């Protein structure tokens, strides 16, 4: 969620992501680089005069992220069907591509899918791998939507927008009709 906040404030996220303080390994949650997050909260507090904590930054980001999703919904987008990957990203796309990495793809089919590749055509293997990967992506969307407080169609729930304080009458009406 921090990425949204960085963009809203015109800040570069590189120092936060790429420069890890030496003492970071001694923090309670080293993967989060909490020292940087705390500094950004202090920075925001100093600029705005409003006391801000790292949790406040997350909440600001979450509000905007959900509001952007709602705006997309209003524009005819912002649902599960729009959360897709390009065909190319699920690959392999061509027979040649599959065959150039046949060992790798064959191993994935056997270990992850439980698909026996012996005697199968390249096209059959490609179709099986694609079907598996697309199903995995659907599972990922389910997990992301649940974590964000959205419904199975990828739309923020009324409960979510109320908890974020963005339950404006037009937002509620939109979610009731399209959510």
Predicted regions and their residues:
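Extended C-terminal regions of large enzymes
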Residues: 1-179
């Amino acid at each position: 969620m921090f990425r949204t906040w960085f963009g809203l404030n015109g800040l570069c996220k590189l120092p936060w992501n790429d420069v890890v303080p030496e003492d970071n390994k001694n923090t309670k949650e080293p993967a989060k680089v909490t020292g940087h997050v705390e500094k950004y909260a202090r920075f925001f507090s100093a600029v705005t005069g409003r006391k801000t904590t790292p949790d406040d930054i997350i909440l600001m980001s979450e509000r905007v992220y959900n509001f952007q999703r709602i705006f997309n919904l209003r524009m005819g987008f912002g649902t599960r069907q729009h959360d897709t990957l390009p065909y190319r990203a699920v690959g392999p796309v061509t027979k040649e591509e599959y065959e150039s990495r046949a060992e790798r793809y064959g191993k994935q089919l056997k270990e992850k899918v439980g698909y026996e590749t012996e005697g199968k055509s390249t096209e059959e293997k490609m179709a099986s791998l694609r079907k598996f990967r697309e199903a995995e992506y659907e599972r990922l969307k389910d997990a992301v939507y649940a974590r964000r407080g959205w419904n199975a169609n990828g739309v923020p729930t009324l409960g979510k927008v109320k908890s974020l304080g963005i339950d404006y009458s037009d937002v509620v009406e939109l979610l009731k009709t399209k959510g």
